[in-house]
Every structure is written in C-alpha cells, then in structure tokens.
Amino acid sequence: MDINYERPDPYYLLNKIDKEEKNKNRGKLKIFFGYAAGVGKTYAMLRAAHYMKELGKDIVIGYIEPHARMDTMSLTKGLPQIPVKNIDYKGVILREFDVDKALLRKPEIILVDELAHTNAKSQRNKKRWKDIEELLDAGIDVYTTLNVQHIESLNDIVANITHVSVRETIPDKVFDDADKVELIDIEPDELLKRFTDGKIYRKEQVKRAFNNFFTKNNLYALREIALRRTADRVNFEIEIARLSKGQITVMATSDQILACIGTSPSSARIIRTAARMAESYHSKWIALYVDTGRSLGKADKETLNANFNLVELLGGELVTVHGENVADQIIRYAELRNTTKIVIGKNHKRTGTLLHFYAKDVVDKLMDSNSYIDVYMIPNSSYYRDHKNSILSKISIQHKGSVKDVLKAIIIMAITTDIAELFSYMGFKDVNVIMIFILGVIIVYMATKGQIMGIISSIAAVLVFNYRFTEPKNSFIVYDKSYLVTFPIMMIVAFIIGSLTNKVQKEAQDSNMREKRTQTLYIVSGKLLSAVGTSEVVSIGIKYISRLVNRNVICYLADTSNKLSTPFVYKKDKGAKEEIIMSKDENAAAYWTFLNGKESGCGTSTFYRAKGYYIPIKIKNKVLGVIGVSCPSGPLRPQKKAVVDTVTGQIAIALDREILSKEQEKSKVEIERERLRSNLLRSISHDLRSPLAGIKGAASTILENGELIDEKRKQELINGIYEDTEWLIRLIENLLSMTKFDEGNTKIKKDVELVEEVVSEAVQRSSKYFKNHKIKVSVPEDVIMVSMDGSLIEQVIINLLDNASKFSPKGSTIEIKVYEKKKDVVFEIIDEGQGISEDILPNIFDRFFTNGSKISDSRRGVGLGLAICKSIVEAHGGKIEAVNKGSGGAIFKFNIPKEL
C-alpha cells in the first residue's frame, strides 16, 4: 500500500466533488431521525417548518401521518397543505402523498412524513423515498422523518433485539446522502410515560406494543444504535472535509485504535490488546505493518504471516506501508486515519551497552514527535531473544550464497584484480587502485542475491590489495603503518556502498513488483467490465489470479439448485497438477465456504489440512460461488491473499452485473409477454366477434325461416357458416402453434419429403378458401428431396397463401415458385396486390402486427400467421423475408437447407 501524505486523499476528494456536483441544482434533504415512534420527530419537523415560514420561505405540508398527540397535529395549522390522494384498496380508504401535485405546486420546502413508507399499489413509485427523490431532483427541499429500525443495514440488528421484523426499509445510501440529519432524542423513561399515557398509540394498541416493542431494554438498545449511526455519519462527513483538503491533523471525533505490528512473536500480544481495547471502546482498530525494505528470514516471514492471520481472525483491518523511518510512517498513517490511540511494543534497554545509551527506539520517537495521540506501550521482554533469532535466521537462510553467486563473485573479483594490476602497471596511485576494488565489490553486490557475497568480497578486496599492491608484495606483511587505517576504511566504505546499492536495487524490484501488480489489477478490472457472460467473467478472473499469485486456481459457481456446479480450472502451466480438485476433502472445503460464506482451507482454522485456500465470491450477503487457490508449499502470504481478495471482489461485482442483466432481460420478456397477451385478447375479441356473429346470424335465419328460404340462399348461408368455422379453426391452429413455440414444446419431426408433394398438399388443403384467386405452381422438373417437417411447411405455405389472398384483388393470380439455390431450396409466394409499405416491412413478421389498410375480405386478422411462418422456418435452419415486386405486388420467400 503506497500512500502519498502530501496531497488530498483522492477518494475523499472525489466524494466531496461528486456530492457538490450532485447537489448543484438538487433540493436538500433533511431527516428528523429517532430511535422509536413517539420521540418527537414530526413535532420537531413542524416546529422547524413554522420557523422557516417566519423567515419568508414558501413551505407546504405534503403529507403528515395522523398522530394521537393533539399538540403535534395543532402545529399543522397555519401551514398550507397539498391535498392527499384517497385510494380505495379492498374497501379500505388509504391516504397517500400526491407527488404529482407537489411537483406542480413546486414550493421551496415540503414536509413529507414517514420516509420508509410503502405506497399503495396504484402509486407510481413503490416506496415513498422514491417520491422524495423526484422532489429533490426537481430542486425542492424536503423535510422528512425516519426511525433507526428502517435503515436497511440495521434492520436485522433491530429485529434481533426487539424480535419484531420491520418490512419498510430504506437503502443506507438515502440516509448517508441526506444533507442534514437532526437526531431527536429523549430519555427512554420519558418515552415510556408518553406511551402509557396513550400519546403514541391508541389505548387498544398500547398493551400489545408494550409487550413486544416498547420495553425499557429495547428502547435503550435502540437509542444506542441511533446515536452510534448518527455519530458514524458525522465522522464520515468530517473525514471528507478533512482529507479532501489534504489536512491530516487528528480530529478525535471517535476512538480509533492503531496496533503497530512486526516480525516479533510478541506482536501477537499487541494485536490481542488492540482488539480488546476496540471492543471496550466500541471502536474500529487497524493493524499497521511498516515494511522498511530489509530482508526477512524464513522464521520472520512465518511469524509475520501468523501475526497477519491473527489480525484477520480478530476482525481488524490490516494495512502495510513502506518506508525507512518507522516512527514517521506510524505518525503519518495515524494522522491520515484520524487515529486516537496507538498500541506498540516497548523493548527493554540493556543499560550496559553504549549503543542503547545513545539510541532511541520507535516508542521514544513517537512520544517526541506526537502530542495529540495516546500511545499505549506493551512491554516486550523477549525482544533480544527474538532479535537474536531473527539475525541468525537471516544469516543462515536469507543470505546463504548459492554456488552460482560464489562463481559470480570469484569471476568479478578476479577481473577486478586484473584491472587493478593494469592500473598499477600504468603508474596509477594506490587510491585509484582502491577505487577499482570498491567498484568490484559494488558489482558483486549487484550481481548476487543477499549480502553475504558482498561482505566476503569486501574482505577479499582488502586482502588482495594488501597481498598484491603494498610493500612487500605477495605478502600480508605491511611496512607502511598508514595502511592499517586504509584497510578497514576501504572495507567499511565498500560494505556501506555495496549495502546501499543492494538496498536501492531491492527497493526498485519491490517498486516494479507493486507497479506490475497495480497495472495487472487495472487490466483485470477493465476486462471484467467488458466481459459478456458468466463463463467469460470467470475465465478472465481466475486467469489473472493465477498470474498474480503464480498458483493453480479453481472456481465453482452456484447452480440453480443452490449447489456448486462443474468447476472452471486455470493451471499456471500445462504440466501442473490439479491437486486442489483431486480429493473429497478439497470439495468439502469449497462446499463449506459456499454454505457459510467464509474462507477455509490452507492458512485458515477450517479444513486447515486442505491443499487449497478457498474464498467465497460474495456480494450483498449472497454467495455466488467459490474461488480456490492451490497451496502446495504452504499458505498464501498476506500480500497475495489481498490480491486474491481484490480480484475475487471484482469477479463478484461482474457476476452480480450478469445476474442483474439476466433478471432485467427476464423482466423485459415478462413485460413483453404480458403485452402480447393483452394484444392477443384484444385481437381475438375483435376477430372472433365477426365470424361468430355471422355463424349465429346464418344459423338463426335457417332455423327460423328454413322453410321460407329457397335452396340456393340456404346453401349460401350454410357455406358462410362453413367458411367462418374454417377460419376460426385456422385461427385456433395458429394460436396453438405459437403457444407451443413460446413454451418450447414444438418438436420438429424431420423426414425426407418430396417438395412437389408438400406444395401440392398445401394448395389442395387451401384451394377452397381462395376460390376468387388463381393459384399457379412452378416447380422444377427434377425431383427435389428435402429433410423437413412436411406438415409444418404446409402450414407456412397455407398462411402465406392466406395472407396473399387478403391483399390481392379478386381474379388475380397467386404464384408459388420453388427452385434450388446452392445448398438451399427456395419457396416464393408471389401476389399481384398493392405491395407492402416500406415503413412496415421491418415489422411484418412480428407477432400481432397487422396492416392498417382495408383488406379484401374485411377481416383484420390477428397478426399471428406470418410470425408463425418465421418461427417454423427458423426452426428448420432457414430464413424468411418479404420484398416488393417492381411491377406491383409482393414476394414472400423462405429457404430451407437441402441436407438429408
């Protein structure tokens, strides 16, 4: 974590700018906030309204909940009121706020009681807070009231305390975004007196409410929650104001504890102390580790990881910063986070050593440079034992030179000696030769890992210089006593410069690593944003997790039955073993994480023997799946855990976006389906009426006047009944076909069919309907065989013929043309009608789409025939289209693949 203390915090600065931009032309929201009904929220709101009226403000009442307290209701007098809506709901008259009248009236300030209220179903918005959003967007200031149990994030907490579940809630963001929150607070004893006097509820409701909600313990708990929630909001506002200006001086509005930890085992004591203090003060706590860039041995790394895990276990926030001056970094970060208390270990000094007589430890420096943050010192009597073990660990493990490093050092020092010999031969003085050796030592530091080779090279450089370049040469004897000073200085200078070089090199490597990690996280964030589909989101996510932590990664997603589906796996290399999915234990760990929404596996206390580390893909308290990372060589380091957590969080957001997208699509489909149902009922009611009326009229004429009607007229009436009945049958067939396609129940039963026979059968079945038109059929002489569902293709041809007959003049010709084109068979139905308007061509195959022009048989049609044709043709893998003929009329053509 890299922090720039010299400039405003971008997060808080953006928050401030965003709020200012958002509120530029927007109304202001003021919430009168309380911990229970009866504390006086509405009373305080009405008092404030009268005060604003005295100042000359245009203020009106939008809605006030009727109260039992007469002194509250009396305050409504003298304030103009917008009439409420009276809505009849199942015989009960409901009074609702009329947002449209309020927007039309557009006062400066409006009073709307009960922010969390749920509107009646006939209202435009489901929730009253959405009505208030409309008022704010229109530039109207709003006063409203709210109880603590109606805030969404506190709903469960309040329910656990009171055993009463409140359904009417508002999002936390509505409360947090309010411009002002005024806490209305009274003592619980006074509230209980109001309650028993019947000033809050009617007498008949008092007993039931007293037994369930209005108990003294409940009211004290609710009061504390309300006070704390208000304090949290004020604290966040202070943070925005403070850090957006780059001001990092501590403003102790609430307690926050900073635990300073390191590689010492005694840091565990500091962590536990900070956690206990945070619990006592009801405050947050942060564990801070300052990475000075020094190399850590294996034991130090293990201890540090154990300390990091303890922080997570005890619920603290873990932060790592980088810097050489530990005390300075602690003070700066404490100021940045508005910390009021620092907990740090204090090392016992050994008075017998000169070093400790002059040296100041971190605690002393903190005390000297800080006068406004409390520092709590935890004695660390085991410091020297820990420090000794740390040094031994670094010498034995961290700085162990490899054979490759030894060879590098020997070669570099050999070359350095040869160059020094050359300089000496050319007459250069000893000081120049010494510089050559120092340069060689620096190169050794740069070329090898750790410091052991550099230290050995420093000693070797002094010995070689003494042996080869001082009198007597080729001997370790020194005649000139000044060299006794030169040699140690030469060795110390070489060591210091080499160490600094090594440190700079390590810092550069760390910086590059952090930069690479940040860049990768930025890339994965962009890719996840642009990913389409669950599979792509997961594939991108686990791929980049694997790259960042250099491990195999697995991802399980929840299926529709709320179980884990077949996993996605990404291996860091093709030959890597998939050990994280090979055993039942691993699956059990992943499933436990899925069910409980908590991490498990290697490095945790649950399924700790597992070979993988499992973390839930979680958003809004819903677990969408599980990410698993293989741990063949031990638990992940905290830095890598943080990376996995970050990318997993991004995956969760992307998956949630996909779920929302699918739900929106599903909602659109449902809305469209409802619209189609409405259109269908409207169309059918019109289209059934005409033929049924005709059938009824003809039948009644025959029944009542059968003997008086001549045979010819009677036959005409019977034919009319028959034709209308056939038309109704075709309509019902089309409706059934479309319903089957919608439900996915239509099965295409393909058989090899003779095209000529299918066309002939369709013409024969429909010829009696088209007596006023000539049907012409043109098929190739060669036999054409196609794999298709013959009965469905017949229905397509009949529907197209029916459509052509409706829009063609009597006596005109309708032609059916069939021909082969590449791998398809093309069917064309050509009429001599008026053609199709260019405006309706794109929609002609849509359901319930009908041409508004008058048709030949005066029947409007439901608008399903062409839609069914499209569904059938596409189910066969073909396409259907309509075009206009140049000489008048239209051509409907569709193709079917010939494959047998």
UniProtKB/Swiss-Prot annotation:
Gene3D superfamilies: 1.10.287.130, 3.30.450.40, Backbone structure of the membrane domain of e. Coli histidine kinase receptor kdpd, Histidine kinase-like ATPase, C-terminal domain, HUPs, P-loop containing nucleotide triphosphate hydrolases. Pfam families: DUF4118, HATPase_c, HisKA, KdpD. It comes from the Bacteria. CDD domains: HATPase (cd00075), HisKA (cd00082), USP_KdpD-like (cd01987). Residues 683-900 form the Histidine kinase domain. GO terms for cellular component: plasma membrane. The chain crosses the membrane at residues 406-426, 436-456, 482-502, 522-542. InterPro entries: GAF-like_dom_sf, HATPase_C_sf, His_kinase_dom, HisK_dim/P_dom, HisK_dim/P_sf, Histidine_kinase_KdpD, KdpD_sf, KdpD_TM. It is an enzyme of class 2 (transferase). GO terms for molecular function: ATP binding; phosphorelay sensor kinase activity. Keywords: ATP-binding, Cell membrane, Kinase, Membrane, Nucleotide-binding, Phosphoprotein, Transferase, Transmembrane, Transmembrane helix, Two-component regulatory system. Its EC number is 2.7.13.3. It catalyses: ATP + protein L-histidine = ADP + protein N-phospho-L-histidine. It is a multi-pass membrane protein. The modification Phosphohistidine is found at residue 686. It is found in: Cell membrane. SUPFAM superfamilies: Adenine nucleotide alpha hydrolases-like, ATPase domain of HSP90 chaperone/DNA topoisomerase II/histidine kinase, Homodimeric domain of signal transducing histidine kinase, P-loop containing nucleoside triphosphate hydrolases. PANTHER family: SENSOR PROTEIN KDPD. Member of the two-component regulatory system KdpD/KdpE involved in the regulation of the kdp operon. KdpD may function as a membrane-associated protein kinase that phosphorylates KdpE in response to environmental signals. In the central section; belongs to the universal stress protein A family. This is Sensor protein KdpD. It comes from Clostridium acetobutylicum (strain ATCC 824 / DSM 792 / JCM 1419 / IAM 19013 / LMG 5710 / NBRC 13948 / NRRL B-527 / VKM B-1787 / 2291 / W).
